[in-house]
Amino acid sequence: LAAGKVEDSD
């Protein structure tokens, strides 16, 4: 669970 983790692949 990634809570507060803003890591998105564009």
From Swiss-Prot:
Protein name: Gastric juice peptide 1
An individual GO BP term: digestion
Origin superkingdom: Eukaryota
